[in-house]
């Protein structure tokens, strides 16, 4: 959530930054007007309360001296009624302010490219060279069926579209991947966490999914619980409402969890395969950092995700998302896109973001600065390290062989009992 004081004192800068994120200046102007009216009413309320205190003292003095206080009582009752009217107005204005400010996206960092959509994203670097196949490549969903490791038909029967069963060496490959990913992140100083897979509405607000993106989630009917869309939500909210010791920062968390997405706006997109599912595993990275260190931590986090792809030998590129393509809470985001041969293109497999103090303000996560003893908002970062199902897809396609088999990347073999290849039955 944005700082209302910043909007008040640096309106033009904030308006210009949010314009690049699709927010009209009229929205901010209305917010500023509401804020000004609210502050005026607060002053009036305080002045009336001071009058009421004086009137109350005068009534008490009159009663002690056994004098009549009819007029003073009438005056105080009028003042009290005026205070109640103003307080009711303040409640209404506070709600209007909340309705606007809670759905405003984060302001982009100055280094973020300005643009409208993914066409304006900027490629930063590439790693690896896509393999030159001398046979016709198969899509991962066909490979999965032919190898008897992915079962889409029974997934649809048991649950519905965009669900599947992993089986045999497919299940082992999925498990090998997330164990490998977790082990690599632990080497880099991340604490492994097993999170709840349901969170409450306050947690969803804290990380920015609520109220704006409710339709993208699965809520449990008649409860305060939501299935997590990403482990970012429980990991970030771990410290919600707390004040951390500045000497402990930065703090690194990692977790593997299922992620549940309704994909409300994705009808007709990626209807086959592992790219877009309602339920998938993802290894998440979350950091809590001091503001002056957070962008250095973003580069490290991105490198941590790249490390996984490099050790798996998967070609990828790093993209800096433009202002129009970034997620709601992000101030800056790098996407890692892995090469998918059957589609002859790169597809997102990780997204690493610095939200600055946007989530920390919503979730009230602060730290005590050891330098001056002041309590301040920290910065939160999050990143995929990696989306496991998409990594399975990338391995199946990039490591496929002409005979229909798939070679298992060397780093995963210890996690798969020494298996070196997945062969057709």
Curated annotation (Swiss-Prot):
GO BP terms: selenocysteine biosynthetic process; seryl-tRNA aminoacylation
Catalyzed reaction equations: tRNA(Ser) + L-serine + ATP = L-seryl-tRNA(Ser) + AMP + diphosphate + H(+); tRNA(Sec) + L-serine + ATP = L-seryl-tRNA(Sec) + AMP + diphosphate + H(+)
Compartmental location: Cytoplasm
Record-listed L-serine binding positions: 230-232, 284, 384
Pfam families: Seryl_tRNA_N, tRNA-synt_2b
Subunit structure: Homodimer. The tRNA molecule binds across the dimer.
Domain notes: Consists of two distinct domains, a catalytic core and a N-terminal extension that is involved in tRNA binding.
Protein name, per record: Serine--tRNA ligase
Organism per entry: Streptococcus pyogenes serotype M2 (strain MGAS10270)
Gene from which this protein is expressed: serS
